[in-house]
């Protein structure tokens, strides 16, 4: 079981400097642009730096404009995870770009042999010739562009090189493609200009398959953290396997009926939702026709009921979006339950007033309140810091001081 005890972030995105201790349930609030989402992303990357690829076009913005580098340190009960980010200098950027093009050349040299009668060349000669022609097209302007869109990630004492060189690579390969195919067509005796054109287009298309990539090797992956962006949960959940989906669907149906999330619900799956009218007659509604609030809570439950999240860390981005207050309340109870019973650690951002205040209602059981008094933190993000409140402090601020815990 993995549990975070503290998070320290320096120079990552909008966060200049932040150090917070964490509990089992962590509610992250604050105004826009104070770093709420950045905090969740920092935690995710500290466990799974390979996710840096997901930032693709925005790699250059991951390091705060006022910093030369970013550092994320996450303390857990079993050790420390550290991720450092820095921009490469011109020399390193050039080396990274050349290596990336070399890797690309190695991957397409067989395609060249398939398109042309080039048995007069050995595979090594062919690969070397193609590599030389592509690399000859690299200019200082290309390297400067690559430098702006690349990062060096230092993770657990090892360096990993990540670059988005899409525009520069396309220009280099486009300029080299015609030269390559004409040369080999000439030397192999091919006169088919259509093949030449198709090959050039195919060469560019093949390169587009992996526009943002790690050079040499990727950092190790981790399954300890799940990031759930609830803005996307109105989309139908992706199915995994028949057996796993059947169990998960049954669990969701049981939860919906037991907690009376939807009136008159009788059965649920991702294709149809069955209801029973007052007359006793049953009817079905296609899942796609259900409202966004219903789809959002289904999407969250689908993720939270996954066996892989049990006992691990779940990062929730704005639960409550699209949801009716009744859905929000039941979701909150469910989050408390999985944190309390399964040992799941929750870090969630929110602007939702109902979601926050429902943590302090009289509807909670005594056991739930005792749990929250020991394992709840409200992290109120500010421009360059965070105010962390315990359960009792947050409740006093809400009920006695009448403060807005959203930090607005």
Task: Show where each model-derived region lies.
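Switch/communication elements of ASCE P-loop NTPase nucleotide-binding domains
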Residues: 1-53, 277, 281-408
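Phosphate-coordinating catalytic segments in nucleotide- and nucleic-acid-processing enzymes
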Residues: 47-309, 377, 382-408
